[in-house]
């Protein structure tokens, strides 16, 4: 069996656009008839996903798999780091939790993970025509080059040609690209098959002199200037501009608390697409205002974020709004926060034994344990959203005892979550993706506010995502020299060049 061709996208810095460029290439190659898989050896992210077989992986590779039209597979992201503090992360290997590690300990041990990475890659390479590999940060972080497993170190091990991308939108792209190339070793520079200027706004002709000089100084071709593409595709963690607080410009205002350890905030992307719902992220009492809905999102550290809510005054603000009848929704860690007590007597969540009072808005009690529940589920919402079909996944530590009405029922009849008055809690991530709950939530908020709801067919997130991925692929295909990209992999371009 022939081994897959491959191409790797590295960047001059975090946020250079590697994830979306990889998603675009996955889409392009799939459109061209190649069976394609994404791969990132090590991803650091708070947004994660549970696969069909109950394993955990980063959402960036999930989006890339969706772009390629294939089922997300944990082999596409064998190492996932989920920050649990400023100096440590939960380490997930092949979808299973290995434990929490300080950064120094992880860097000492990461070389031992190379066999896991290569087994995952080699397995994919036997099944697919093309592997699109995403690097992390910059390959020129000279303090991190020893035992590198995610940039040039990986490229050497799998013999991958490299596209190096720089973000012109933040300025200094020529220095970024030239400096990165200059700091690489000769054999590493030889792996770069081309440079990409990413996120350009304006007339590309203005760039021509700079591009020519960059090619002369680096002795590398610029394979494309990718425009700033206004596509709405799930993005990674705190670099995401959607986390910046913004005023609601729609009839309904939803305020999502921007917790210090916020995770899986991609849950709320479908709400942003609704014509009546404005979504903003707040991290202070001053920003809170008088929303129509308060959302407590998932968090990687429920206990520490509860303490932050208390210290920031946001707990008191949420309680005041709830007492006045403002609906409150908690998802996963946010659901735990809404309960009466959070029992971390084993110290598995916060690092030392303690039991804390929750916000007390739901009749629930959560006990944290080391065991993590991971499962894809289907469910039907209960009142006041009765009948809405839900699909999503659970991914959490802790077990919650409920003394109240459920938020939904799983397909086997098992009750899940809790509802009390206008306060709702659920462990279900992705609950708005099907569109039905979004419509029912909007109608519910309209009734409470006394405004007329808009009637429209529910927007399925999968359909919207497909549309956005096609827009992304079209924009990148038209900007890149695809003949050169295919040639670097030793493959034929079915479309015969740029379009």
Label each residue range with its predicted role.
Residues 190-192, 340, 356:
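Core-facing hydrophobic residues within beta-strands of well-ordered domains
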Residues 348-375:
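Conserved P-loop NTPase catalytic core
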Residues 339-347:
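Extracellular/periplasmic helix-exit of transmembrane alpha-helices
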Residues 335-336, 432:
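Short active-site segment of divalent metal-dependent hydrolases/proteases
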Residues 332:
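Catalytic nucleophile serine of serine hydrolases
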Residues 1-320, 327, 344, 370-371, ...:
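Flexible phosphate-sensing "switch/lid" loops adjacent to ATP/NTP-binding sites
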